[in-house]
Amino acid sequence: MKLTCVLIVALLFLTACQLTTADDSRDKQEDPLVRSHRKMQKSEDPKMAERCSNFGSDCIPATHDCCSGECFGFEDMGLCT
């Protein structure tokens, strides 16, 4: 009887921990491709660092090559904002 009560309490405790953890991590996960791209742009290692275009420079929206990460334009050509 005591063992059953201990198991039930442990199960309830673990369930509560899972629910609390799930609520805290909501909307914090970033798309892995965007996260790795930002890591490469901010890297101090010259081999890993990627050159990015400054504000007002030409860019290609599909490549996300602006330092700000935002390229305003059409498929082939745009400007970094």
Swiss-Prot record:
Swiss-Prot/TrEMBL keywords: Disulfide bond, Knottin, Neurotoxin, Secreted, Signal, Toxin
One term under GO cellular component: extracellular region
Region feature Disordered, mapped onto this chain: 23-45
Protein name (record): Conotoxin ArMKLT2-0311
Positions with biased composition (Basic and acidic residues): 23-34
UniProt key word Metal-binding: no
Record localization: Secreted
Species name: Conus arenatus
One Gene Ontology MF term: toxin activity
